[in-house]
A protein has these predicted regions:
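Carboxylate/His-rich catalytic cores and anion/metal-binding grooves
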Residues: 24-69
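Residue patterns forming the tRNA-binding/recognition surfaces of aminoacyl-tRNA synthetases
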Residues: 1-11, 23-25, 67-69, 77-78, ...
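Glycan-binding loop/region signatures in secreted carbohydrate-active enzymes
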Residues: 72
Length: 173
C-alpha cells in the first residue's frame, strides 16, 4: 500500500521505498493481501474506514523486500522495491511512492539504487507521452483524472483531502 499526496507524479513511479529497519505485515482485506508497516496497520485501516481485516503470518523485515519487483498500478512497466531511511512511521503506510524526478529524497534514493529518473512533465506543466493516456493534461488537472481512474479500477483504499505545498514553477500553475 503506497500513500501519496501527489497523484500526478504516479506516472513517474519507478520504485516503492520501505525502511529496512521496520517490520512489515501482510494484511488480508476481503480476498486481497496488502503489505504495510506493522506499526501503521491500525492507523491505515482507521484512515481508510476498514474494519474487517486480518494480519496474516508473522511480520517481515523491510530489508527482506529489497530489490523485489512489482507491477505499476496502471502503466505497462515494473518498478523496484528499495530501502531508505527517509521512510518513517509518522504517517502513511511505511511504503513510499518513489519518483526520482519529483523530490530530493526520491532523487537521492533513486540514484543510490540506479533506478530510472522519469520526468513525464514538459516545460509547460503538462504530462508527456510517458504518462500514457494522461499525456497533454496539466499536472493539477491530471490529479482528478488519475484519481478517478484508480478509484474505478479498485486501486484506492481510501483518500483524504489535504492542503499540500509542493515546489513548482509559478509560471506553470
Amino acid at each position: 500500500v503506497i500513500w501519496t499526496t501527489t497523484t500526478w507524479t504516479l506516472p513517474a513511479n519507478e520504485a516503492i521505498c520501505l525502511n529496512g529497519a521496520f517490520e512489515y505485515s501482510f494484511v488480508k482485506i476481503g480476498e486481497e493481501y496488502h503489505i504495510m508497516a506493522t506499526e501503521l496497520v491500525k492507523s491505515v485501516m482507521d484512515a481508510c474506514h476498514i474494519e474487517n481485516y486480518e494480519i496474516v503470518g508473522e511480520p517481515v523485515s523491510g530489508a527482506e523486500f529489497e530489490l523485489m519487483r512489482y507491477h505499476h498500478v496502471y502503466l505497462p512497466k515494473e518498478g523496484t522495491v528499495i530501502l531508505g531511511d527517509h521512510v518513517t512511521l509518522e504517517s502513511g503506510s511505511g511504503c513510499v511512492h518513489t519518483a526520482g524526478g519529483h523530490g530530493v529524497d526520491d532523487f537521492n534514493i533513486s540514484q543510490k539504487y540506479n533506478v530510472p529518473i522519469t520526468v513525464p512533465v514538459d516545460d509547460g506543466g503538462c504530462l508527456t507521452e510517458l504518462a500514457g493516456k494522461y499525456a497533454g493534461q496539466r499536472v493539477w488537472a491530471a490529479n482528478k483524472t488519475i484519481l478517478a481512474d484508480l478509484t474505478e479500477a479498485g486501486a484506492i483504499m481510501g483518500q483524504v483531502h489535504i492542503k499540500h505545498q509542493y515546489p513548482h514553477c509559478w509560471r506553470c500553475h
